[in-house]
């Protein structure tokens, strides 16, 4: 009798322990699930805040650049990287500080994505005269292809365009004066192409 009672007590104890263990496991599972949900919620909120801050930062960073660009275009219409260029009537001009032959000057202009100046109006002629007075500057005019047929570097023939030759020029003195420059008076003169003088480059406004 005592043995049966002891056996029943053992079974009751084991059953109670199992139920208690199951209840403890369920509680732990619920706590873990709640913790996971809480972490997920916090992560979502954090990511949303980070995205909002990144968006604001991008806006703040872009605004000064825009303002600087607008200010820069007013101060330097030919471009922030072309501050040595001068603006005149919708185009940009570079007046060199060194002397060289006509062909070297032409190559220098082309390296700067421009060309030797084409003077096709009184307004541009006056602009060049004012800037080049008392000095000689190459312009983009030559008759190397055909003697006496002067053409600009873009192929324009001077017979149907503006000219401003010095009196008595072009005269091909010495039979080798095939390139034109602006004389000290501002008028044009033909001279041999290996002569070294300053030069003027021309290019359109940057887009």
From Swiss-Prot:
Localization annotation: Membrane
Record-linked SMART domains: CLECT (SM00034)
GO molecular function: carbohydrate binding; pattern recognition receptor activity
Record keywords: Acetylation, Disulfide bond, Endocytosis, Glycoprotein, Lectin, Membrane, Receptor, Signal-anchor, Transmembrane, Transmembrane helix
Record-listed N-acetylmethionine modification sites: 1
One Gene Ontology term, aspect cellular component: external side of plasma membrane
Extracellular side: 49-207
Glycosylation sites: 67
Disulfide bonds: 78-92, 109-201, 179-193
Protein origin, superkingdom: Eukaryota
Its membrane topology: Single-pass type II membrane protein
Domain C-type lectin: 77-203
GO biological process, one term: endocytosis
Transmembrane annotation, as ranges: 24-48
Membrane-side (Cytoplasmic) residue stretches: 1-23
Post-translational modification: Some or all of the cysteines are involved in disulfide bonds.
Principal location: membrane
Function noted in UniProt: Hepatic lectin is a membrane receptor protein that recognizes and binds exposed N-acetylglucosamine moieties of plasma glycoproteins, thus mediating their clearance (from the circulation) and endocytosis.
Name of this chain's protein: Hepatic lectin
